């Protein structure tokens, strides 16, 4: 099983530009001396992770989770988990539950300790603020900063202009405050159909930043909400909800990926108008952008991932080939390895592509120190030791972990008939081949030195069994074991005692490092050999593996007992990653 220990080269406090910003704010006392509604002092650093519950989180979200929760931890602050649940058509409690589970699995908590020593949860939903958001929208209308537009979505898009042409003002832009208020209230009352009206901010239709050309703040959507039911038929847009939620929760540093950089002026515009109306007061939260995580040989588009699931090109959202967090967890990745990966990737201001080998290297480095060892024969060939007594067996032993003697030894039997890897025998070996061939001696790892004496073949000339004799005084760990020198060492399991297991060999899901770049059809890049299911023979103790126990199968790589399909006494194993980097091949 796995043995917990943090990866030694993890550096959660690595310097980045966001830490520099926070350090400057702390030095200037920007957020010092604040209090919550109960008069309790607020931390000087409060971040948040605000996913929309419309899908499963993927490896790209892990970077944001580690960043937001990690900064809050390192600066003695807190991080909120907030669900941006403003689009009832796409959201579901299934996704809410999966996100909560994923953040917990990564090792983070949104609880803080109250003055009475009790944990204070900081789990929020944008829908918690629907009443306040509506009231704040009316405030903007009363200030002449928002209006109800009766154009269609197509007309609004057509009149927005482009980078070289200014937008055209809506013919409804100059409605009176009274008319706008009445229309907005009628929208809430359900008097209009979807798309009949929207509420827009009144900013500048000639703004160089197209985001600022009277963006939509509210739209009509007659849809059942997973938390508020049918109470609302109008819903706020992300840009309106996001900044207000931050302010209501006393967020200090609102961290977003780079695609939201052009939205930052709107973030500030909404909060400044509400501050000037007396709703909020300084210091307001501030938005900062960082580069998103782009991983080679993967896609993270929710729409495209859903297509893979819907078309049954993968075995669900938790398929071990998927980049979803439920997928990489089932693959056998550890939370610590993902945190290590995020630390190694770092935080930058410009988008870049991260090679898959960086992720797999982090997994490999983490598991090397924690995974118990075991022996597995994946492509079996029978080996018969002719001079070993029939019906007899003896114990061999090996360390549970070669660098952790305190974990003790594992014991497994050796008998007359063994399984070895087919690639460890070659009847006509090439130069430099030191494993088993007729007349050659090798060591059975943890066992005896043997000499190959012959082979059995089927009618087609295929080798179906190898014969050998063993040298009795050469057993590993006994006096004189090294009296016979050999160059080759092979692994094995006793045929009579081995655990016959289903093993799934996973590889990259795509053959193309950028499967959906440049207008490609990402489906064309699917790797037809990304999953192979085999029957393997394992040392008998592995039969007791529990779901999510991780092992290094010696000479093969790292494997995990599948968390979904394993049953007591019958674990199914997934290959997590090989022993060496395979991405440069």
Curated annotation (Swiss-Prot):
Keywords: Aminoacyl-tRNA synthetase, ATP-binding, Cytoplasm, Ligase, Nucleotide-binding, Protein biosynthesis. Signal peptide: none annotated. It is found in: Cytoplasm. A motif ('HIGH' region) lies at residues 51-61. InterPro entries: aa-tRNA-synth_I_CS (IPR001412), Gln-tRNA-synth (IPR004514), Gln/Glu-tRNA_Ligase (IPR050132), Gln_tRNA_ligase_bac (IPR022861), Glu/Gln-tRNA-synth (IPR000924), Glu/Gln-tRNA-synth_Ib_cat-dom (IPR020058), Glu/Gln-tRNA-synth_Ib_codon-bd (IPR020059), Glu_tRNA_lig_a-bdl (IPR020061). The keyword ATP-binding applies. One of its GO terms (biological process) is glutamyl-tRNA aminoacylation. Its main location: cytoplasm. GO terms for cellular component: cytosol. A motif ('KMSKS' region) lies at residues 299-303. Gene3D superfamilies: Glutamyl-trna Synthetase, Domain 2, Glutamyl-tRNA Synthetase, Domain 3, HUPs, Ribosomal Protein L25, Chain P. Its EC number is 6.1.1.18. L-glutamine binds at residues 84, 238. PROSITE patterns: AA_TRNA_LIGASE_I. Belongs to the class-I aminoacyl-tRNA synthetase family. Monomer. NCBIfam families: glnS (TIGR00440), PRK14703.1 (NF011291). This is Glutamine--tRNA ligase. It comes from Cupriavidus taiwanensis (strain DSM 17343 / BCRC 17206 / CCUG 44338 / CIP 107171 / LMG 19424 / R1).
């Amino acid at each position: 099983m796995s043995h917990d220990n943090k990866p030694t080269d993890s550096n959660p406090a690595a310097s980045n530009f966001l830490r520099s910003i926070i350090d400057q704010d702390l030095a200037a006392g920007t957020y010092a001396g604040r209090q919550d509604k109960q008069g309790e002092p607020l931390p000087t650093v409060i971040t948040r992770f605000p996913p929309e519950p419309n899908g499963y989180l993927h490896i790209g979200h892990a970077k944001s989770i580690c960043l937001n929760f990690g900064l809050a931890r390192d600066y003695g602050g807190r991080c909120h988990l907030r669900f941006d649940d403003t689009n009832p058509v796409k959201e579901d409690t299934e996704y809410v539950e999966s996100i909560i589970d994923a953040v917990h699995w990564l090792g983070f908590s949104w609880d803080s300790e109250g003055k009475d020593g009790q944990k204070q949860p900081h789990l929020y939903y944008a829908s918690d603020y629907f009443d306040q958001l509506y009231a704040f929208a009316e405030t903007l209308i009363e200030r002449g900063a928002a209006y109800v537009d009766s154009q269609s979505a197509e007309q609004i898009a057509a009149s927005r202009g482009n980078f070289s042409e200014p937008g055209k003002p809506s013919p409804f832009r100059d409605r009176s405050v009274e008319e706008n208020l009445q229309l907005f209230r009628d929208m809430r009352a359900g008097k209009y159909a979807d798309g009949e009206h929207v509420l827009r901010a009144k900013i500048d239709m000639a703004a160089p930043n197209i985001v600022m050309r009277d963006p939509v703040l509210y739209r009509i959507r007659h849809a059942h909400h997973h938390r508020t039911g049918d109470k609302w038929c109008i819903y706020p847009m992300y840009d309106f909800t996001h900044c207000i939620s931050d302010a209501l929760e006393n967020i200090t540093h609102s961290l977003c990926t780079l695609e939201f950089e052009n939205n930052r002026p709107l973030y500030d515009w909404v909060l400044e108008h509400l501050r000037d109306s007396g709703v909020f007061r300084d210091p307001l939260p501030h938005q900062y952008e960082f580069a998103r995580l782009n991983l080679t040989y993967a896609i993270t588009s929710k729409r495209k991932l859903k297509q893979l699931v819907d078309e049954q090109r993968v075995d669900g959202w938790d398929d071990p080939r998927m980049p979803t967090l439920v997928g990489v967890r089932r693959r056998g990745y550890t939370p610590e390895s993902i945190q290590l990966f995020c630390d190694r990737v770092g935080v930058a201001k410009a988008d870049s592509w991260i090679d898959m080998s960086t992720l797999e290297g982090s997994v490999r480095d983490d598991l090397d120190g924690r995974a118990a060892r075991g022996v597995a024969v994946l492509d079996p060939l029978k080996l018969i030791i002719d001079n070993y007594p029939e019906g007899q067996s003896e114990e061999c032993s090996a360390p549970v972990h070669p660098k952790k003697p305190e974990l003790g030894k594992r014991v497994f039997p050796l008998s007359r008939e063994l399984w070895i890897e087919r690639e460890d025998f070659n009847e006509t070996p090439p130069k430099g081949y030191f494993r088993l061939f007729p007349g050659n001696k090798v060591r059975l790892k943890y066992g005896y030195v043997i000499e190959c004496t012959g082979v059995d073949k089927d009618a087609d000339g295929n080798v179906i069994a190898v014969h050998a004799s063993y040298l009795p005084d050469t057993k590993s760990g006994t006096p004189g074991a090294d009296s016979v020198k050999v160059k080759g060492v092979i692994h094995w399991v006793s045929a009579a005692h081995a655990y016959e297991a289903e093993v799934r060999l996973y590889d990259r899901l795509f053959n193309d490092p950028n499967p959906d770049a440049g207008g490609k059809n990402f489906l064309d890049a699917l790797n037809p050999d990304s999953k192979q299911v085999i029957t393997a023979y394992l040392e008998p103790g592995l039969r007791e593996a529990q779901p999510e126990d991780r092992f290094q199968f010696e000479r093969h790589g790292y494997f995990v007992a599948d968390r979904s399909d394993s049953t007591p006494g019958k674990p199914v194993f997934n290959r997590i990653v090989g022993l060496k980097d395979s991405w440069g091949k």
